[in-house]
């Protein structure tokens, strides 16, 4: 029933107007599963390879015809007649077919699109919602939770054309009892922030992930604006709402220094750890992502020793959803959380393996979108299915972001109280 009858792929556009891969997996019973691969802007150097054409005459060289051809040719031939419900076997066939450490032959974007489309097709054929099927694949059948959203309401760094160095300033509604209420709180704060910025004569255009992207005198000015917005929305910062940062430090780490060009400051690893610690002293920041460069493991150790007992320290560029790298981090006591991005590793199976490794080691796993997104909502189901407890999927604006939030609303409704929203206790160091 769940045997694969056909696979086909096409070039579609992501939220930045760049091509990405969409794959259809059709089963013998006629069931269709469809999925798109996302794409990042600030990428870790050890991520699986996103295959692009490099043909300057099309899409500025960013076309993905090679990846589409890989799906319509080699991948299709290898998977026809295989069981879409056997996720691990399907993914392993594609990994072996590629034959490289970083999926450089077929492309992580090609393999991932097929991997997710197969999972969707199997779920439909088996008469199950996607989150239920992913939980079955994960060996955690029947266990679900709703994630705390990290809402990126103010953008800087590679996600915006402004002078703010830190890439993401996020709010987390933690005092409510449901995801639906958390979404409402986030939306109210988002609209409040727009009014705060307008009152200061600042630009209210949005960045790649739907957050506002004004020019500000410092990173702390961004935090101050969010604090004012939270309070004007009627909430208490530190009680109802906590803050999270994504520094994306690799983007401003040069010659052994963390260079905050927007502020005209430069720090060594110890100094930057002190800078971040100071922000945490002045604001209720409970999570910091990529607080050090991906290659600065000594700096990561300094940061972990300084803040790791009270702040969630999330490795994104550091770990790139890769179990081999995560294992090293766990052994060395680096960070205490991992950001999970499907396309950093390139298959559903490997993504689930990374989440399990993190959770078994007492690390949290934060499910994440990419800055280049589509209408695909698979990460919403993944967050619920793995009881990850946290999700990053942008601001309360742009359909590519809101699509994931709306899917979570549907899932919460369908589960009728069987997926608790645990709030602050989901965040490492807070529960």
Curated annotation (Swiss-Prot):
GO biological process, one term: glycolytic process
Keywords: Cytoplasm, Glycolysis, Lyase, Magnesium, Metal-binding, Secreted
Major site of localization recorded for this protein: cytoplasm
Sites where the protein binds (2R)-2-phosphoglycerate: 167, 341, 370-371, 392
Binding site for Mg(2+): 246, 289, 316
Molecular-function annotations in GO: magnesium ion binding; phosphopyruvate hydratase activity
Cofactor, how bound (note): Binds a second Mg(2+) ion via substrate during catalysis.
Pfam family, one: Enolase_C
InterPro entries: Enolase (IPR000941), Enolase-like_C_sf (IPR036849), Enolase-like_N (IPR029017), Enolase_C (IPR020810), Enolase_CS (IPR020809), Enolase_N (IPR020811)
Active-site residues, as the UniProt record annotates them: 209 (proton donor), 341 (proton acceptor)
Location(s) in or outside the cell: Cytoplasm; Secreted; Cell surface
Catalytic activity: (2R)-2-phosphoglycerate = phosphoenolpyruvate + H2O
Cofactor(s) essential for the protein: Mg(2+)
Record pathway: Carbohydrate degradation; glycolysis; pyruvate from D-glyceraldehyde 3-phosphate: step 4/5
PROSITE patterns hit by this protein: ENOLASE
Superkingdom of the organism of origin: Bacteria
GO cellular component: cell surface; extracellular region; phosphopyruvate hydratase complex
Enzyme nomenclature, EC number: 4.2.1.11
Coiled-coil regions, chain positions: none
Enzyme class, first EC level, given as a word: lyase
Alphabetized NCBIfam families for the sequence: eno
PANTHER family according to UniProt: ENOLASE
Protein family according to the UniProt entry: Belongs to the enolase family.
Function recorded in the entry: Catalyzes the reversible conversion of 2-phosphoglycerate (2-PG) into phosphoenolpyruvate (PEP). It is essential for the degradation of carbohydrates via glycolysis.
Protein name (database record): Enolase
Encoding gene, per UniProt annotation: eno
């Amino acid at each position: 029933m769940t045997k694969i009858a056909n696979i086909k792929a096409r070039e579609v556009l992501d939220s930045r107007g760049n091509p990405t891969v969409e794959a259809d997996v059709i089963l013998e019973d006629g069931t269709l599963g469809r999925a798109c691969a996302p794409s990042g802007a600030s990428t870790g150097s050890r991520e699986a390879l996103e295959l692009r054409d490099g043909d300057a005459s099309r899409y500025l060289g960013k076309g993905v015809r090679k990846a589409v051809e890989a799906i319509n040719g080699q991948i299709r031939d290898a998977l026809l007649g295989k069981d879409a419900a056997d996720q691990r076997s399907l993914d392993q066939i594609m990994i072996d077919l590629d034959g490289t450490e970083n999926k450089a032959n077929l492309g992580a974007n090609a393999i991932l699109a097929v991997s997710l489309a197969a999972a969707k097709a199997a779920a439909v054929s088996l008469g199950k919602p996607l989150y239920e099927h992913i939980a079955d694949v994960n060996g955690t059948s029947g266990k679900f939770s709703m994630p705390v959203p990290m809402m990126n309401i103010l953008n800087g760094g590679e996600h915006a054309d402004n002078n703010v160095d830190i890439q993401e300033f996020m709010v987390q509604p933690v005092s409510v009892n449901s995801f639906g209420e958390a979404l409402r709180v986030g939306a109210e704060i988002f609209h409040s922030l727009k009014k705060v910025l307008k009152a200061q004569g600042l630009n209210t255009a949005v960045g790649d992930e739907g957050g506002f992207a004004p020019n500000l005198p410092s990173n702390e000015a961004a935090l101050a604006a969010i604090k004012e917005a939270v309070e004007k929305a009627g909430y208490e910062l530190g009680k109802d709402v906590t803050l999270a940062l994504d520094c994306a430090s690799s983007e401003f780490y040069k010659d052994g220094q963390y260079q905050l060009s927007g502020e005209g400051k430069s720090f060594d690893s110890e100094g930057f750890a002190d800078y971040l610690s100071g922000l945490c002293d002045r604001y209720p920041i409970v999570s910091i992502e990529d607080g050090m460069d991906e290659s600065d493991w000594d700096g990561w150790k300094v940061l972990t020793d300084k803040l790791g007992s009270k702040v969630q320290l999330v490795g994104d560029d550091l770990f790139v959803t890769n179990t081999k790298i995560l294992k090293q981090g766990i052994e060395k006591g680096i960070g205490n959380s991992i950001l999970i991005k499907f396309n950093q590793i390139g298959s559903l199976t490997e993504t689930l393996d990374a989440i399990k490794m993190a959770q078994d080691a007492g690390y949290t796993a934060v499910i994440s979108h990419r800055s280049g997104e589509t209408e695909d909502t698979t990460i919403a189901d993944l967050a619920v299915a793995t009881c990850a407890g946290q999700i990053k999927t942008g601001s309360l604006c742009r359909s590519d972001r809101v699509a994931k939030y709306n899917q979570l609303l549907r899932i919460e409704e369908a589960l009728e109280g069987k997926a608790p929203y645990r709030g602050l206790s989901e965040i490492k160091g807070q529960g």
